[in-house]
Design a protein with these regions (language model features):
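Class II aminoacyl-tRNA synthetase-like tRNA-binding/catalytic domains
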Residues: 1-99
Length: 99
C-alpha cells in the first residue's frame, strides 16, 4: 500500500533532472554566462493582456499599497533590467506562473 506522503517522482527521474540541470549550468559556466535569480513575487501584474496573473495578499515589510503581490508570469522584464544595468550575458532557470 502506497503512503500518501511518498514523493511521486522516482529517484531515477530526480537523478536525471539533477544531471540535466548540472549539464546546463556547466554549459553556461564554460561560456562565462552568469546565472541569476530574479524575484518570484513582484509588485505589479504582467502587462501582456493575454496573460492572467496570480496574486497573493501581502502585508509584510515593503508591502505595496494594494496589499498584494503577483507571481511572475515571466522573468523577462527583471532580466532585461539586469542587462540594461550592465550585467553582461545572463541566464535563469526558474518557474513562472500563469492562471
Amino acid at each position: 500500500m502506497d503512503a500518501p506522503w511518498r514523493p511521486t517522482a522516482s529517484l531515477e527521474n530526480l537523478r536525471r533532472r539533477a544531471a540535466l540541470l548540472s549539464a546546463v549550468r556547466r554549459f553556461f559556466a564554460e561560456r562565462q554566462v552568469l546565472e541569476v535569480e530574479t524575484p518570484v513575487l513582484i509588485g505589479a501584474s504582467a502587462s501582456d493582456p493575454n496573460l492572467e496573473s496570480l496574486s497573493l495578499p501581502y502585508a509584510g515589510p515593503g508591502a505595496p499599497p494594494t496589499g498584494r503581490l503577483w507571481l511572475q508570469t515571466s522573468p523577462e522584464f527583471a532580466m532585461k533590467r539586469l542587462l540594461a544595468a550592465g550585467s553582461g550575458c545572463i541566464y535563469q532557470i526558474c518557474r513562472a506562473f500563469r492562471a
